Amino acid sequence: MRTADFDYDLPESYIAQAPAYPRDSCKLMVVHKDGALEHRIFRDVIDYLNPGDLLVVNETRVLPARLLGNKVGTGGAVECLLLNKSEGATDTAAEQTWECLVKPGKRLKPGALMEFKDADGRVILHGEVTDILPENGARVVRLTPQGNAVSVDLAMHLVGRTPLPPYITEYKGDDEMYQTVYSKTERSAAAPTAGLHFTKELLERIKEKGVRVATVDLEVGLGTFRTVNEDDPAEHDMHVELYTVPQATVDAVRETKAAGHRVIAVGTTSVRSLESAAADGELEAKNRAATKLYIMPGYEYKVVDSIITNFHVPRSTLLMLVSAFSSRDIVMNAYEEAKRNDYRFFSFGDSMMLL
């Protein structure tokens, strides 16, 4: 198996630059176990869910983690993308320390000060670069609220923007369209995009049919956008993400399996959470545990019986994950069929359900 086996040609015109509206009006490709394909609309997903099935969603929410401001002293424009809070660092309402990607990197050395203003031009948040991480060049930045912002979190919501994937370059719409309707805890740098297609009304109809809904919380990092550059995919260093599987979800999975019904994961992040929590054989509750689980063909799924997902980037670990569930040939054939039928790809794109 080579990384090139998961490569495919995709002209830029196939990359969705805006979400479908309504959310559940996007296309849905249903992939059967034998490779047969059906072309539906996403709201028809209810036809493939049975009473007693369990739908597992990732309720994480994307942080307003993109900060645009100025360097104190020179006034030069700066951009700061929050990655994750620094381990063991101060974390209070009045001060937080984050690992960040910054632009322009060469000008933001330890001691550099940044300020971020709200829409009225008032300084709401200060940032001070305190260190540079040698492994990736990220900056450690201490954030403190200013003016009428009583906390760092409030200041971030006043000045921060929702970060979009690098391949979405044209979207100027509502940031809420890059959040799922059931999102709760703000800790992610990217959305669990398979869930973007669900509306509250569709979820209610699904529940009324007798399908249960359970949650996990995987904090999506920027590593989700990394492609595999090594010729041998096994040599790829998988990124770490934190995930939570509540006891209520563990109980729901066990009850569903015992009754002979299916566990259907919404998105690769839900897959990764459930399979990571069952890595030792039995599914166990987890609270912000770290996972480096790398699912590729040859992996035996322990929990998940069906996957709802989007169309993924070439040479990505996510494409390998879905190929491990079905097969590489079936998935790659489905992708070619999607192109022939003008499906839209990636985060704002159309959906696929692997049965």
Walk through the language-model features, giving the residues of each.
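Surface-exposed, charge/polar-rich loops and edge strands
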Residues: M1-L355
